[in-house]
């Protein structure tokens, strides 16, 4: 019978292999973008010239998109706009794979609920995803505090370079994941089953904050719940 630790190692191996594939995807995509920019820059062009993306150009040409040639060359630069969009999209996809698939697989392997599985590195990636999805890729003035990543993101437009992408995947392959499980005690599990939907949400939201869980901070609503449950049991 495979031990829990072995099961987790197998799952992590699958995750690492999948993430490595995304590194290759990023490498080939950004390399191609950069080479296309160099090719365009070597061709004679004017400030007003446009470049088109078309299909079946020899027999039945169809034009699908256009942009100024000079703008395209600029956006094709190494760590330029096009490459930045690729790296951001891949990071969002990688987080989704962790959150929707691999975290659940690990939880099943160790016999707990996925919400009790924590990974500091993926917590850092979640912050990046939040900026991309909910803040239009704009880093707030206060910046971002990471637990594992050593990135110093300036406020303003979020830019994820090729080198940063590699650093992230190196952390995945190294000791950066630091996966841990924080299942509630049997007593707390019993109490959770007696909470109202509103109480449970308040409890779970409170302990979603890493410092509260790590420092074993008491949930402010605990005494009120204990009192309510006690009164119900006496009645």
Features from the language model and the residues they span:
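Extended intrinsically disordered or low-complexity regions, especially N/C-terminal cytosolic tails and loops
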Residues: 1-85, 116-120, 127, 143-235
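Amphipathic, heptad-repeat alpha-helices with coiled-coil/zipper character that mediate oligomerization
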Residues: 51-57, 89, 93, 134-138
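A short mid-domain helix/strand-loop element embedded in enzyme catalytic domains
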Residues: 62-71, 95-107
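Short, hydrophobic, well-ordered secondary-structure elements
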Residues: 83-103, 122, 126, 130-133
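Charged/polar positions within long, soluble alpha-helices
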Residues: 102-107, 130-141, 177
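Inter-helical turn/loop segments and adjacent helix faces that build the functional surface
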Residues: 107-115
């Amino acid at each position: 019978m495979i031990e829990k630790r072995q099961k987790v190692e197998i799952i992590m191996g699958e995750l690492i292999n999948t993430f490595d594939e995304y590194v290759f995807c990023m490498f080939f995509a950004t390399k191609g973008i950069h080479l296309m920019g160099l090719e365009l820059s070597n061709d004679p062009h004017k400030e007003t010239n446009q470049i088109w993306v078309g299909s079946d150009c020899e027999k039945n040409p169809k034009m699908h998109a256009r942009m100024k040639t000079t703008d395209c060359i600029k956006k094709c630069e190494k760590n330029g706009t096009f490459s930045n969009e690729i790296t951001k999209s891949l990071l969002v996809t990688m987080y989704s794979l962790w959150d929707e698939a691999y975290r659940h697989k690990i939880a099943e392997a160790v016999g707990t609920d996925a919400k009790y599985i924590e990974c500091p590195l993926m917590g850092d990636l979640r912050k990046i995803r939040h900026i991309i999805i909910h803040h239009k890729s704009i880093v707030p003035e206060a910046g971002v505090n990471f637990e594992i990543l050593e990135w110093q993101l300036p406020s303003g437009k979020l830019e994820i370079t090729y080198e940063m992408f590699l650093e992230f995947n190196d952390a995945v392959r190294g000791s950066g994941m630091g996966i841990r499980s924080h299942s509630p005690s049997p007593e707390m599990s019993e109490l959770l089953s007696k909470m109202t939907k509103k109480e449970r949400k308040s409890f779970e939201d409170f302990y979603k904050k890493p410092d509260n869980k790590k420092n074993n901070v008491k949930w402010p609503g605990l005494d009120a719940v204990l009192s309510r449950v006690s009164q119900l049991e006496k009645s």
